[in-house]
């Protein structure tokens, strides 16, 4: 029964995650496996048997032969086989280890040493009482549009939002866009405000706070749901499906890079790991040269960064380190390698290992507990959750600085067809580097730089097994997620090209990323889960990807590593393995699909060097190694020249006056460190540019009166 439920869950995930044409290809692939000839074509010699008719369909082959076929796909020279193998392996393992059964538990967790939901949260909720709970200002600001249903207009009116009852303003807003099919329809709703902000993460939260506190009426659109701290389950599977973009399974078009992005109120700040870095000075100098903008080396930017640091209450110290961070620090110290303590937007004693699924204590400085909270307290903002922006509305600008003038946004409520037209003086798009370009392109903007120059900070992983007697207490999933890091330099290099850090580790992600070579081998890997330390190397990439749109308007993300970045990634893998060895791992490995496990105990230096040479020789061929990304930058670059950038030095698009971009997409290149503080600092500068423009418009309109 459990296997049947898991297969149904996997089939459901495939329907949600795959594009129609790819889903059809997978159906054909599976149909072929259900036939003898098809299995022979796809499985080759491994599908042959010694008994008549000498070859069988996949389901009737022995387990050994099935495993041979799967291993063959994983290491195939044909990229299509590797991609299919990776797809099924990752989804299957994730489903098996995140499935919640009766009682909120999974039958595999006890065997692998995993406790499930955060025990501290469970205990605190059992002991707490709802009596006397004060109203949360953010909760009062959020309007769940899908839940409001037919009463949405009344709910908006009660919240102080100006509702447009006349169809004429709706038609004017719709006709302002160059695309078709935007005319008003029955059931549509129109509202008016000063500024509409698309997105509630790093960029959107800062923008909303600055403008609302200045007295302007702000409407924030967020396609994801809002979760109160008391609603957060900290269960891996349900949390990813509710809070992550595309259920946590977003990837580049060829499946080569797995992408993590937030799709909830708070955006990426709700699910990130709290790491705070100031923008490195050498990066700021580089950005000045690339963009032609003085902003990045100005006093204005330094003051903005200082403001962000203060508002996030960034703490430079920690009370204690967990298993993974302790191993990273100890290994670096034994190698005399540089190692530092990560500053975090959380208290020094905040050691929640589940913060990647929202922070139940509310202590992490996500936008929900900082900037959005400030906007809510101003009483000048509302946030419409489960409301996705589909078009920016603009019209010809006969007397302005640019050809077109922003007029508002057309959005859709949840899965319904109900549309909301928001009329505004200014529009700020802060949907992130992966989602901002499609919105601009679908709205009719034509600047050729929109979507180009995407950087992903590609991440690769290494693991080491540390038995209980190794001297490091705890498990891989408990304690503060990120507290230590080590910079990686090129030979004779002055600045880091990558960082060695540790990831959040829970069974579903661990199982989906670990190499699979056989059922028995994978069972052993999972049995060691709680004492397996995973390190990650985050590369400052020079590769350039692109975000474009499919014929149906959906995002298409293309990204290919260049030779320089491939070499940097291999440097990161090598350093991570050496750190694990130095810290005392008894066995180590990578996430290369060959799945080699190297036994450190008893190995001499020659054995170790031979192993590292083998790892390097395998390289980072697409879909032969797991590559992830949680930092997305540069797809709508800021600059002084419209021929080389998508927005100007104020964050305003070159084509449309009053339309701004304020997220990681405006960064001129990869930053090389966790980008939250940098994105918010740039957003703070852009927010004051928007504010200055609004003040100017307000003064102009009052002067005419």
Predicted feature residues:
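Glycine-rich loop(s) and the adjacent beta-strand/alpha-helix scaffold that form part
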Residues: 210-236, 258, 264, 378, ...
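Acidic/polar surface patches and capping/hinge elements
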Residues: 1-100
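Extreme N-terminal leader/targeting segments of oxidoreductases
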Residues: 1-8, 12-19, 80-194, 692-705
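N-terminal FAD cofactor-binding segment of flavoenzymes
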Residues: 216-217, 223-282, 325-333
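Conserved redox-cofactor binding core of oxidoreductases
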Residues: 108-172, 176, 294-396, 406, ...
């Amino acid at each position: 029964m459990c296997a049947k439920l898991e297969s149904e869950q996997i089939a459901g995930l495939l329907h949600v995650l795959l594009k129609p044409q790819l889903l059809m290809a997978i159906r054909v692939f599976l149909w072929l496996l259900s036939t003898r000839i098809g299995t022979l074509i796809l499985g080759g010699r491994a599908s042959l048997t010694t008994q008549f008719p000498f070859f069988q369909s996949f389901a009737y082959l022995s387990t050994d032969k099935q495993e041979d076929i799967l291993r063959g796909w994983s290491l195939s020279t044909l990229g299509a086989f590797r991609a299919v193998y990776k797809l099924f392996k990752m989804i299957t393992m994730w489903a098996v280890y995140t499935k919640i059964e009766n009682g909120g538990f999974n039958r595999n967790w006890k065997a692998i040493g995993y406790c499930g939901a955060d025990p501290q949260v469970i205990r605190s909720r059992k002991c707490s009482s709802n009596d006397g709970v004060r109203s949360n200002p953010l909760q009062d600001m959020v309007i769940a549009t899908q839940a409001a249903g037919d009463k949405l207009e009344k709910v908006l009116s009660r919240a102080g939002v100006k509702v447009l009852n006349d169809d004429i303003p709706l038609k004017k807003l719709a006709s302002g866009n160059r695309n078709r099919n935007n005319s008003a329809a029955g059931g549509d709703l129109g509202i008016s405000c000063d500024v509409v902000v698309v997105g509630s993460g790093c960029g959107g939260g800062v923008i909303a706070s600055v403008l609302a506190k200045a007295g302007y009426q702000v409407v924030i659109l967020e396609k994801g749901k809002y979760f109160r701290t008391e609603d957060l389950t900290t269960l891996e599977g349900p949390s990813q499906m509710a809070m992550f973009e595309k259920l946590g399974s977003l990837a580049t078009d060829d499946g080569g890079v797995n992408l993590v992005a937030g799709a909830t109120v708070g955006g990426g700040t709700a699910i990130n790991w709290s790491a705070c870095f100031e923008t490195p000075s050498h990066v700021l100098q580089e950005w000045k040269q690339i963009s032609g903008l003085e902003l990045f080396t100005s006093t204005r930017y330094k003051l903005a960064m200082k403001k962000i640091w203060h508002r996030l209450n960034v703490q430079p110290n920690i009370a204690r380190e967990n298993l993974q961070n302790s191993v990273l620090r100890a290994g670096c110290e034994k190698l005399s390698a540089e190692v530092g303590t990560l500053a975090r937007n959380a208290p020094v004693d905040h050691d929640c290992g589940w913060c990647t699924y929202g922070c139940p204590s509310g202590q992490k400085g996500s936008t929900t507990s900082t900037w959005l909270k400030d906007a809510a307290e101003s009483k000048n903002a509302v946030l419409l959750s489960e409301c996705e922006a589909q078009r920016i509305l603009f019209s010809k600008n006969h007397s302005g600085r640019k050809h077109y003038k922003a007029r508002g946004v057309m959005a859709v409520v949840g899965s319904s067809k109900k549309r909301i037209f928001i009329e505004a003086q200014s529009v700020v798009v802060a949907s992130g580097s992966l989602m901002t370009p499609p919105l601009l392109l679908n709205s009719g903007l034509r600047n050729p730089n929109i979507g180009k120059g995407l950087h992903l900070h590609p991440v690769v992983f290494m693991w080491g097994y540390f038995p209980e007697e190794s001297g490091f207490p705890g498990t891989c999933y408990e304690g503060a997620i990120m507290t230590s890091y080590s910079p990686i330099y090129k030979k004779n290099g002055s600045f880091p090209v990558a960082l060695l850090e540790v990831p959040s580790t829970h069974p579903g992600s661990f199982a989906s990323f670990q190499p699979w070579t056989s059922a028995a081998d994978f069972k052993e890997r999972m049995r060691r889960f709680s004492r397996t330390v995973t390190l990650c190397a985050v590369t400052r990439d020079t590769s350039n990807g692109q975000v474009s749109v499919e014929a149906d308007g959906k995002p298409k993300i293309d990204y290919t590593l260049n030779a320089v970045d491939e070499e940097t990634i291999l440097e990161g893998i090598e350093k991570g393995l050496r750190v694990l060895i130095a810290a005392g791992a008894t066995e180590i490995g990578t996430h290369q699909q060959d799945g080699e496990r190297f036994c450190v105990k008893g190995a001499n230096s020659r054995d170790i060097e031979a192993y590292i040479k083998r790892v390097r020789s395998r390289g980072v061929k697409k879909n032969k190694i797991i590559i992830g990304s949680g930092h997305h930058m540069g797809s709508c670059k800021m600059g002084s020249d419209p021929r080389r950038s998508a927005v100007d030095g104020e964050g305003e698009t070159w084509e449309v006056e009053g339309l701004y971009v304020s997220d990681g997409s405006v960064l001129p290149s990869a930053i090389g460190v966790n980008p939250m503080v940098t994105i918010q600092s740039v957003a703070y500068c852009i927010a004051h540019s928007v504010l200055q423009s609004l003040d100017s418009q307000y003064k102009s309109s009052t002067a005419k009166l």
